[in-house]
């Protein structure tokens, strides 16, 4: 198997925990703790991403070698790997939670890659489920196959949808059982274990900065800020104050663009705590996430959030801004002034508004989003919610609407209830007439309009029930559906004849099934 070129700047340039013990503890004055992955009994490759493997320089023979499974299950290290778990805190459901840290994620190192054109990349390789760390609290540091499949598939599905995200190299089974109480209801059971190798330029989170501010460690906070800028934002220069202000604006801008993309494809993160917010504006930590089936701005897949629905679909833009405010509060001791932080927060609002308008225009096939279009969108969203209409199928079908004879007929497959469709039909036809009138103002040829809309409205998304079907099969040792689902999600905007079933709306059996309509943080 090919070796990687590793340049582990995080552990070389920032202070680490001098205590080598993996015992759970509060870690002070350090950005990380060195820790070894815990070996497993029978590592075996379940699935892998060809694109991420190629990004790192691995070919298929590398990936299918026993050495590959051993390394990415945590049983062996490649030359130059220096495993560690990061120290961070976070606000969880709006409240400060103190030290959290990588409780079952272990970073192996930073791989440096060079493309044929000379462009270099830096990729942190992180194992999720590789055993206990000083930050594991009361947990075992392991992950179950169920949650690992969901993380692996969604990481790659989001990338191919065009949403900023961490990636996934591979999914490796451990041959061991992990005990989990899926809904914390006193009914634990043993489930198959697995390890996912996550890949990103950086796994630094908002919480990495918050922990040092909460402890009054301004010196280490400053070091981490300047390190992050130097490694992850090398294009920024100038005096420290200027560079830091530009950096915070970049973080706010990237976060805004990410959230707009979530809203475009109907993704609900489910647990937008500040420790789950990437400093690079990447979607990170795929836990109790879900995809909008029937359009509902008030829906959240996370049972832990079922009461307050803090992280519901329609509230995600607001929560991202709130999280950036917590980051701004954490950074204030370094900045020493509120103005550049306020500028970043204001920038988030402006960029999100611009990106959201651009996204809405694209989904509807408009060149630009005018102020008069807001009413059209508000009316549509209210109608989709009341009539229980599938978001993905509706917008995909809208591209094929006959503008000379607009009718609800080609959109009927998007309705979950025939009764609600019948009730909504007059109002829907009225909206379609208004939409047709607005669309004709564009003077865009029908074929061109269809191609443009189909490039932003996916045919395939990782619906919760599809992931659950793959999980059910994998738990019986059948992994073919995981691989097929990955392949489908690699081409979400293509028609893919013969794979229509992967574009079907949620079946009735999945409406209230665990893993399909409701999920927990148990993993």
From Swiss-Prot:
InterPro entries: SelO. Mg(2+) binds at residues 276, 285. One of its GO terms (molecular function) is magnesium ion binding. The active site is at residue 275. Its cofactor is Mg(2+); Mn(2+). ATP binds at residues 101, 103-104, 128, 140-141, 198, 205, 285. Keywords: ATP-binding, Magnesium, Manganese, Metal-binding, Nucleotide-binding, Nucleotidyltransferase, Transferase. It catalyses: L-seryl-[protein] + ATP = 3-O-(5'-adenylyl)-L-seryl-[protein] + diphosphate; L-threonyl-[protein] + ATP = 3-O-(5'-adenylyl)-L-threonyl-[protein] + diphosphate; L-tyrosyl-[protein] + ATP = O-(5'-adenylyl)-L-tyrosyl-[protein] + diphosphate; L-histidyl-[protein] + UTP = N(tele)-(5'-uridylyl)-L-histidyl-[protein] + diphosphate. Its EC number is 2.7.7.-, 2.7.7.108. Nucleotidyltransferase involved in the post-translational modification of proteins. It can catalyze the addition of adenosine monophosphate (AMP) or uridine monophosphate (UMP) to a protein, resulting in modifications known as AMPylation and UMPylation. This is Protein nucleotidyltransferase YdiU. It comes from Aromatoleum aromaticum (strain DSM 19018 / LMG 30748 / EbN1) (Azoarcus sp. (strain EbN1)). The gene is ydiU.
